[in-house]
Amino acid sequence: MGFFTSVLGIIGFVIGIPIGLILGFFVLIYSQPSHQEYPPARPLVETSISVLLDLLPDIPLWMKNPDYERVDWFNKFISYMWPYLDKAVCGIIRSSVQPLFADYIGTFCIESIEFENLSLGTLPPTVHGVKFYETNEKELLFEPSIKWAGNPNIVLVLKVLSLRIRVQLVDLQFFAIVRVALKPLLPTFPCFGMVVVSLMEKPHVDFGLKVLGGDLMSIPGLYRYVQETIKRQVSSMYHWPQVLEIPILDSSTASVKKPVGLLHVSILRARNLLKKDLLGTSDPYVKLSLTGEKLPAKKTTIKKRNLNPEWNEHFKLIVKDPNSQVLQLEVFDWDKVGGHDRLGMQMIPLQKINPGERKEFNLDLIKNSNVVMDSGDKKKRGRLEVDLRYVPFREESIKRRKESREEKSSEDDDFLSQAGLLSVAVQSAKDVEGKKKHSNPYAVVLFRGEKKKTKMLKKTRDPRWNEEFQFTLEEPPVKESIRVEVMSKGTGFHFRSKEELGHVDINLDDVVDNGRINQKYHLINSRNGIIHIEIRWTTS
């Protein structure tokens, strides 16, 4: 009898433990307190220092940090707009996740996934302070502190083996400091090309998850595991320097196209050109340009009294879009008096040239680029021989530039022999003043004997030019400098119409090493004048 009693006791123990655990689990997740007591409220001045330290994380940033500003007006705006924002955001969520749900249907015996309810609740997020940054870039940079303790009603229904499983998200909390950059700033509405978002610290995420009516987050250990996993995953994707880029404007219209390469053009020779002069000869020269450029066309020398000229002259043209730009070649007869007669022309799309490949063209000259009008012209206008090579720029990081210069001396020699493009962007100036009451400032860029000017702005001490100039170079400008002068020009009848408001000499070694500098400089011979200049060096 004692043996059977021992066996039954062991069986009862083995069966009782799982049953007890299951019953305890359901009692834990379904039990709700019947009576809740709220703590007494006391004035803040009556609290101790330890209590204040506990409350410190909940105090708005504009109270703790003077760099953060209050944005009550923005919170009111969000509050009034929240019912409409709720529906708009939920509509975007529905359309975005439907394809994801479709991928899971048929796997793990899932027959359907759909939202039974989808609402972000009645409590909008609030911004507890905003910090703005001043940068030298064309961007608007700010950091809002966002807190959202919402009451969303999000119910997802999964149908598995004809069984409906309801999953409900409740009591969502999300606290984060977000860095937002609107860039680049543009003259096209809405005046910025994209929104770049990143998190400055790990976000605080808290929520309840009910499955079949029970709170799954009440299971010991599961809540902390899920919370840490979400923080880790979100931080790995969006914690600075990782960013989320949201394009606003199309790339074709978002910004001014930057140079992407150099087109090396060799004008070799021409044959059997038209006779335009009275003596049966011509004085030909070639004008060459790229479509879509506002820069003046480049010209060869004039070959006097020659219908079969030999030039062998070389030019470099800046390419911004090799897929759409076209090289336009025009042959003119030079005349001392009156306009120059066009002997013929031809056009070469850059798409016909592979990057890095040298290609020679022997072109039949035509009257004009209009195919319909030119088809009726049977006159032979001669031939033009040119040699083309398109060399795209290389995008290199600072680290790669420095490593390439430190690895070998031979590689260093190759680096110093690379041709490239020096771009100088004169952005703006501040507090430039001369002897006269009103200044009409403009900037002059001086480099290797070349002089380039910005437009003149009338009656201002804080001009904004935003103009860029390019210099094509055969080698990097090592141990060289560039001078930028700010001048003022009188608009009336003055004996001394020009006046220098200040200047700056910029060493280009840092530009060659780093590829780019973007700084503000104090003007020499100016009391408080500052000029903002960006310089880029791009190798081909």
Swiss-Prot record:
One of its GO terms (biological process) is lipid transport. Keywords: Calcium, Lipid transport, Lipid-binding, Membrane, Metal-binding, Repeat, Transmembrane, Transmembrane helix, Transport. Residues 67-249 form the SMP-LTD domain. Ca(2+) 2 binds at residues 277, 333, 335, 341. It comes from the Eukaryota. GO terms for cellular component: cytoplasm; endomembrane system; membrane. InterPro entries: C2_dom, C2_domain_sf, SMP_LBD, Synaptotagmin_plant, Synaptotagmin_SMP. Ca(2+) 1 binds at residues 277, 283, 333, 335. Its cofactor is Ca(2+). Pfam families: C2 (PF00168), SMP_LBD (PF17047). It is a single-pass membrane protein. GO terms for molecular function: lipid binding; metal ion binding. Residues 240-363, 401-521 form the C2 domain. Residues 227-509 are annotated as: Phospholipid binding. Belongs to the synaptotagmin family. May be involved in membrane trafficking. PANTHER family: EXTENDED SYNAPTOTAGMIN-RELATED, SYNAPTOTAGMIN-3. This is Synaptotagmin-3. It comes from Arabidopsis thaliana (Mouse-ear cress). The lineage of its organism: Eukaryota, Viridiplantae, Streptophyta, Embryophyta, Tracheophyta. The gene is SYT3.
